[in-house]
């Protein structure tokens, strides 16, 4: 039997991109952080196998503004395994061959890696994430309040398991506990069908469990507040 307790976190940053699945090449961001991205931020600050997070509400603190940038990106990725992968390079650095962003005119296997892509991003964002911290099997010596105190302490001290990001790894998220003076932006938007989260199987090793499907739901921003609990009541699956 599980038990839950409420937590809240303020996050902000200069740039953010919560990519709409249909626009993953020329990236186009949702106007608001997705529940799955918000959950990822919470897990980046504090995570243990016996807990999980369930978002209830997201408050948008600043007006929604977009910006567009064009960047040089690469068409391929570096492999981990194999004779030319990262693992082999770690064992024998002499065999390291850099993966070049601009290799125009090269005749080897890398070919022409560079490609220019446009991205429509959010700028100057800030949110308050309200969620339930769920303890899977609480005990008298391991209550939910214990984990909330650990989460709040880590958030106040700027500690994290890994650097949380705002949709893309290079867009770092700053975070702190809310101070109670924040006010929601006066934004009202029909966000359409939004990605809620990915559905992972519950059996097998954690690192070897690809998502079975994606979960989507209708989303609406009312006076700067996204009701994630209402989204959860209208989920549908997409393979």
Model-derived features with residue positions:
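N-terminal, Lys/Arg- and Ser/Thr-rich interaction peptides
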Residues: 1-25, 223, 229
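Short helix/loop capping segments that flank catalytic or ligand/cofactor-binding pockets
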Residues: 19-20, 69, 139-140
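A short, structural micro-pattern
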Residues: 3, 52, 121-125
């Amino acid at each position: 039997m599980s038990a839950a307790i409420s937590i809240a976190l303020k996050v902000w940053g200069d740039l953010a991109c919560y990519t709409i699945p249909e626009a993953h090449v020329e990236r186009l961001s949702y106007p608001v952080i997705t529940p799955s991205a918000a959950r990822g931020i919470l897990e980046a600050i504090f995570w243990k196998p016996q807990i999980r997070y369930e978002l209830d509400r997201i408050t948008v603190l600043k007006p929604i503004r977009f910006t567009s940038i064009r960047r040089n990106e690469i068409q391929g990725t570096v492999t981990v395994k194999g004779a030319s992968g990262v693992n082999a390079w770690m064992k024998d650095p002499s065999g390291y061959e850099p993966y070049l962003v601009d290799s125009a005119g090269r005749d080897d296997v890398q070919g022409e890696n560079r490609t220019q892509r446009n991205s429509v991003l959010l700028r100057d964002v800030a949110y308050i994430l309200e969620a339930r911290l769920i303890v899977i099997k609480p005990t008298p010596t391991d209550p939910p309040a214990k984990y909330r105190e650990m989460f709040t302490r880590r958030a106040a001290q700027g500690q994290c398991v890994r650097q949380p990001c705002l949709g893309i790894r290079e867009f770092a998220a700053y975070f702190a506990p809310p101070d109670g003076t924040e006010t929601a932006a006066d934004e009202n938007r029909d966000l359409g069908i939004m990605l809620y989260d990915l559905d992972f199987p519950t059996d097998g090793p954690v690192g070897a469990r690809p998502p079975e499907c994606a979960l989507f739901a209708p989303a609406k921003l009312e006076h700067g507040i996204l009701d994630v609990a209402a989204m959860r009541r209208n989920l549908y699956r997409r393979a």
